């Protein structure tokens, strides 16, 4: 089956989603840079008691998490990985302090991550033949 940005993740296996995440991270490493330590990733199902999110970056575990039950399309998966990879590159030491002062939508690190997200079509054009 050919995979497109609009392909529903509900039609995909976890392995297929993991491949997209892995290739997106490789693209990020080549095009956005890395840190002295690497980043891991995991594709999971987010429990119902949690606030819905496409993904998150776990700073303490240096892991990008993608929640397949909340990222409905391949486009959402790629955008989520780009967004969370931006957080991996950022210094998050004062993240929570700034979050309390300005909120999520105006947080400078969230604004920056949303800008990185917009690179999804460039990323997808580079990785789609590896999926």
Language model features: what each stretch is:
Residues 13-37:
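Zn2+-dependent metallopeptidase catalytic core
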Residues 82-90:
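Short active-site segment of divalent metal-dependent hydrolases/proteases
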Residues 121-131:
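Long, well-structured alpha-helical subdomains associated
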Residues 1-12, 39-50:
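Hydrophobic or amphipathic, alpha-helical segments that drive membrane association/targeting
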Residues 75-79, 91-117:
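Post-HEXXH active-site segment of zinc metalloproteases
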Residues 44-75, 92:
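Active-site scaffold of zinc-dependent metalloenzymes
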Residues 35-38, 95-96, 127:
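Short, polar/charged, Gly/Pro-enriched helix-capping and turn/loop motifs at alpha-helix termini
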């Amino acid at each position: 089956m050919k995979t497109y940005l609009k392909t529903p993740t509900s039609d995909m296996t976890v392995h297929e989603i993991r491949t997209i995440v892995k290739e997106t991270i490789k693209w990020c490493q080549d095009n956005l840079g890395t840190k002295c330590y690497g980043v891991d990733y995991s594709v999971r199902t987010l429990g119902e008691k949690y606030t819905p999110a496409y993904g998150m970056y776990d700073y303490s575990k240096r892991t990008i998490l993608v929640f397949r039950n909340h990222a409905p399309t391949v486009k959402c998966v790629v955008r989520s990985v780009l967004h969370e990879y931006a957080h991996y590159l950022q210094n998050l030491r004062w993240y929570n302090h700034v979050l309390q002062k300005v909120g999520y939508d105006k947080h400078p690190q969230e604004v920056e991550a949303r800008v990185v997200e917009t690179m999804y079509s460039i990323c997808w054009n580079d990785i789609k033949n590896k999926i």
